[in-house]
Curated annotation (Swiss-Prot):
Protein name: Protein G1-like5
Compositional bias per record (Low complexity), positions renumbered to this chain: 26-39
Broad class of the protein's primary localization: nucleus
GO molecular function: DNA binding
Residue ranges occupied by any ALOG domain in the UniProt entry: 40-167
InterPro entries according to UniProt: ALOG, ALOG_dom
Region feature (Disordered): 1-45, 157-204
UniProt KW keywords: Developmental protein, DNA-binding, Nucleus, Transcription, Transcription regulation
Amino acid sequence: MEFVAHAAAPDSPHSDSGGGGGGMATGATSASAAGASPSRYESQKRRDWNTFGQYLRNHRPPLSLARCSGAHVLEFLRYLDQFGKTKVHAPACPFFGHPAPPAPCPCPLRQAWGSLDALVGRLRAAYEENGGRPENNPFGARAVRLYLREVREHQARARGVSYEKKKRKKPPHPSSAAAAHDDAANGALHHHHHMPPPPPGAAA
């Protein structure tokens, strides 16, 4: 199984315009292409897939997708660190664990854990969409999962931030809220019209 490159995006201006009375067909094609333009996620996934394919071709020796393993995915993720924009403080840095350092420091810039985690998710999906078998997916390898966990824990300590997901409170169900409102209204109405009992010994 070889890497399937996407030479042009669906909305590329270099589409085949044809000749000889194809104006209306071209307009219809353009309109349908515009209506079926990929989502932001799909566009990013395609760019990531093309970037990974370029990395495999530039690898020494060049790698085919069929020979790609979790170890090669880790090489790719470490390669991307040189383009990172997230400051990750070293243990010896005085700002280690400081979420808002007051001054600059020489610590390196790295890819943020969240970016790497999202990238792996997109590439894992793209691998299978391009003919890869789920059981052979290198982006789902245990080594990749462990690496992402280590990056998350290290960056959380170095940057003094927490990556724990906050639990969102579920809003009350509309029907339940309406029922509660009706019950409260009925209770208030009933209380308003309920006459107090006569005092003991009152004349009938």
